[in-house]
Amino acid sequence: MTEEFETELGNRLLRYAAIDSQSDEDSATTPSTDDQYSMLKLLEKELRDIKAQDIQITDYGVVLATIPGNKKGPTIGFLAHVDTAPQFNAKNVKPRMIKGYNGGDITFPDNPSLILSPKDF
């Protein structure tokens, strides 16, 4: 994988993680929020941009697409969900990647007193 491609994938993941896609337990619709549907539409657009085929969003909020391979081999699938648990605050999230993570504590730039420690998990 080239460094440019790796950077693009990393930036895409960070952008997805920053989207407020919190579920609404009281909703009778699927997806349960407009933000979740917006994320599905973003994924649909990005799949079109990379020339994926057979793109569709199902009534259950699932994006399906085919990305043809560049050589013969087994078919693979990628699965993920777009919702965030309702117990989690999904607003104003500032995701980041820590390259070369050493397994120690992680501090948060906006609140250095907030620490994520492997000892707590």
Task: Describe the predicted segments one by one.
Residues 5-6, 111:
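Alpha-helical interaction segments
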Residues 23-24, 54, 89:
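Secondary-structure transition/capping residues
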Residues 28-83, 93, 98:
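A non-catalytic alpha/beta surface segment that caps or lines the substrate-entry region
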Residues 74-121:
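Active-site metal-coordination/substrate-binding segment of hydrolases
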Residues 1-2:
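Charged, compositionally biased N-terminal leader segments and the immediate start
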Residues 6-34:
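N-terminal capping segment at the start of a domain
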